[in-house]
Amino acid sequence: VKRLLIGCLLTSLLFTLPAMAAADAAEGDVIITLGENLTEPQKQKVLEEMNAPDNAQIITVSNAEEHKYLDGLIPRAQIGTRAISSAMITIGAQGSGLDVETHNITWVTKEMYTNALITAGVKDAKIYVTAPSPVSGTAALTGLMKAYEVSSDKVIPDDVKKVATEEMVKTAKLGESIGPDKAVALLAKIKEEMANNPPQTDADLRALIEKVAKDLGITLTEEEINSLISLFNKMKNANIDWNQVNDQLSKAKDKLSAFLQSEEGKTFIQNIIDILKEIWNAIKSAFSSSEPQNNQ
């Protein structure tokens, strides 16, 4: 349990701290994607919420584009018939990494977006995802990738878009059974291992998944393992820059280590330890109070 708590804590920190990378677009460029079916009042509300600059480039995302990447991954009813998810991408300085924030997104966590965007090759950007009312958040990734292509003048290969979307959805589904933080940790660690030592066969891939899950204290069903084997086989065959993925993960770890050695990091860790102690003491107290008392 202690190992698992530490692993989840480190993974949360890994994705909270910006993953370092490089970008070609100009620092400060802002691209906004608006769902095509937003009403005018909703558009204005979203833009105000984003504090969008007047010179921001605005593009729209259609429901058809959302279905292109999500069909077959989640029920069509969940995708819906209206595109309302919106996002703002602000290009950061070289090496600033990814910083994702969300609002009204109920199923996909910001760490899941970060992990999927790394797979898609998105880097060095501050990202804000929102909707006028609570939504699952699955459709937003389509807009994010489209906006990044416009801002960076780079094309994300279609097979990479599809596998990044599948990664996001499968991580969210897995999060329902093992918890979102554990799901993100599992997928990130498997990708790191694949970048360093690509498995050659399905048996190798299964062994890798089972080993990483065991190391993180996670129990997977046979169905979940097979689903992950399918996902990572698609990643192996997609046009993914594994050197970049590995580089971002390595630099993020270096940044995490520096943070943990800083006064801010030490204070943060101590606060976590204090909270865990309080929880443990509360549990002990609850068990003690529930023990039968002997009458004297």
Can you annotate each of these PLM segments?
Residues 44, 111, 115, 142, ...:
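Solvent-exposed, polar/charged alpha-helical surfaces in well-ordered, non-transmembrane soluble domains
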